[in-house]
């Protein structure tokens, strides 16, 4: 069981959140040290992992139980993995000796507002909430990076994604506050800023709902997922993998999708600027979310610099699709093909028992995958048998 959380409120001050962080971390660390399990959130789940289909040599296991597990941020050399949610809670999975077996789960903070976007760097944790961006310092102090009143504050697509880029800047995806509609300001963009919040600017426009991005390890170019609009039929529009090779590009929304096909709501209206088409089209409504370029040495050599993309799964398609992890093979810095890597979270009866969200890599080269439906974080390993 998790420790009792302080009374939550969506508008807690940063000082109150900081005090909660320090109190909860102190309580949980004491509990772990004396050998109790009050902070562990493991052992209760019994997911049917045998239903999952992986390539030969690969294995998957439960790394930790985390309610509503969404975005992942690996910190402290893999000793901590922060886990965000779409509710009000923030967690951290501990693995002190980095053996790939979690020691416990800390309920780091509550009372946050959709703390989905996480980025860990230099001992600090950035949390992109729906309405602001804050930063946890190692001593528990909480600084405001972007205050309320600047970012759009809508629940629809209000779950941010965040990461620190090769340039040291913090990047945050801001979804459109609707299905298909007029947008303005920071809506439907990916923004970037200095770690202190200064020099805030729009990096990419025309982005409906990006919930994952990463930079190619060789070229340094950003690739991000984007979800196509709903209620246009089972087969359109495709989900996308986009290449942002430079700042200032427009990726079509809400005017066009895919290779320039107009959204019906904007038929006859040309985009204000030239748009950039996706480099990979996934099946419509598969809900492509997390993306990670493999950099490790555990997997076979031909996985290096390929991308893993999670598909959260459809919610209003006649025949459900997604609920799996895709592998996108890259050649010379560009996508060459795509294939299913792990499948089986969708049952034969058409009902899912898991919905994968984000993917991250531990220092040993194993992969972590979050599942907000099952409330789990999985670990995928490879052994040459």
Model-derived regions, located:
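Beta-propeller domain segments
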Residues: 42-54, 159, 176-179, 193-198, ...
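Conserved beta-propeller blade signature
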Residues: 80-82, 124-127, 169-173, 221-225, ...
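Asp-box/WD-like beta-propeller blade repeats and closely related beta-sheet repeat scaffolds
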Residues: 131-165, 173-176
């Amino acid at each position: 069981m998790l420790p009792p959380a302080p009374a939550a409120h969506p508008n807690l001050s940063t000082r109150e959140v900081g005090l909660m962080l320090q109190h909860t971390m102190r309580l949980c660390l004491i509990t772990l040290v004396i050998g109790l399990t009050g902070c562990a959130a493991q052992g209760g789940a019994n997911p049917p992992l045998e239903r999952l289909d992986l390539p030969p040599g690969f294995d998957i296991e439960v790394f930790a139980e985390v309610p509503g597990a969404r975005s992942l941020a690996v910190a402290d050399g893999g000793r901590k993995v922060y886990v965000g949610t779409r509710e009000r809670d923030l967690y951290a999975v501990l693995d002190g000796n980095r053996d790939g077996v979690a020691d416990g789960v800390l309920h780091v903070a509550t009372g946050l507002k959709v703390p989905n976007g996480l980025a860990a760097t230099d001992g600090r944790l950035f949390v992109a909430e729906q309405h602001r961006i804050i930063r946890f310092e190692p001593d528990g102090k909480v600084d405001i990076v972007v205050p309320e009143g600047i970012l759009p504050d809508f629940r629809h697509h209000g779950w941010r994604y965040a990461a620190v880029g090769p340039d040291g800047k913090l990047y945050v995806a801001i979804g459109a506050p609707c299905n298909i509609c007029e947008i303005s300001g920071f809506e439907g963009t990916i923004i970037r800023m200095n770690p202190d919040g200064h020099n805030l600017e729009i990096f990419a426009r025309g982005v409906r709902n990006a919930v994952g991005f990463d930079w190619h390890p060789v070229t340094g170019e950003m690739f991000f997922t984007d979800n196509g609009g709903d209620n246009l039929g089972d087969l359109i529009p495709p989900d996308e993998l986009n290449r942002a090779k430079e700042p200032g590009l427009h990726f079509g929304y809400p005017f066009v999708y895919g290779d320039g096909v107009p959204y019906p709501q904007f038929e006859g209206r040309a985009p204000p600027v030239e748009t950039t088409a996706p480099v990979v089209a996934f099946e419509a409504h598969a809900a492509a979310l997390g993306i990670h370029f493999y950099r490790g040495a555990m997997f076979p050599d031909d996985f290096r610099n390929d991308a893993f993309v999670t598909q959260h799964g459809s919610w209003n398609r006649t025949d459900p699709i997604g609920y799996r992890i895709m592998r996108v093979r890259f050649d010379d810095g560009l996508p060459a093909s795509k294939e299913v890597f792990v499948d089986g979270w969708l049952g034969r009866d058409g009902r899912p028992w898991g919905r994968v969200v984000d993917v991250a890599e531990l220092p040993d080269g194993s992969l972590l995958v979050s599942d907000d439906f099952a409330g789990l974080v999985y670990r995928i390993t490879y052994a040459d048998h």
